[in-house]
Amino acid sequence: PIESLELDTIVHEFHVLFPEQYVSFNYLAGWVYFHELAHTDLASNSSVWRECTGLLAQSADGSMHHVANMDQSPPAVRNVTLHVRFVNGSTARKPLFEGVDWYWFTTGTSRMVLPGVVSVQENWRFSQLSHKVVLQDIQAGVVPQIYVFRRSLERVAAMNPPITFDEMVDEWSNTRLAAPFYIVMAGAKSGEAAIIARN
């Protein structure tokens, strides 16, 4: 898929910009499944740096507000947080949606905004799973958590008319996952807000 080609490009750029730092395709591909693997019996049981916070509020005028932090481990990776814009190269690089995250080096992000439609973030949901079950899900093609929002928003950004907020809630409530998480999201209209607990 396209994400594989993008990972190859990121590996190449790391080699050009930081030749003393070895970064491989396999290393970055492992990060694509960080969230899923961190929920397994192979990971530390420590809950340190595994929490994030999302806040949804509505102003008196009905405007929705969505803010979030990113307390995910490892702490040092926060130093590579970027504001990223996903663009369609065939339409004069028109931005489709954007995000702020350090997961950019996986070609996905865990916090995204599609203007006029939705803002969304994932938050850690505690659970320990068998690594065998998670690896079976990965081999079966379950979408990595870090691509859930990207793949939806790529499709939605091309729709005319765009998908509704309620349809986004339904889609993300039913997307097959290999590991649990919370989805915190707000829409563009008054009252459009949801927190989805996924197992």
Model-flagged regions — what are they?
Residues 175-199:
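C-terminal catalytic or substrate-handling cores of phosphate/nucleotide-
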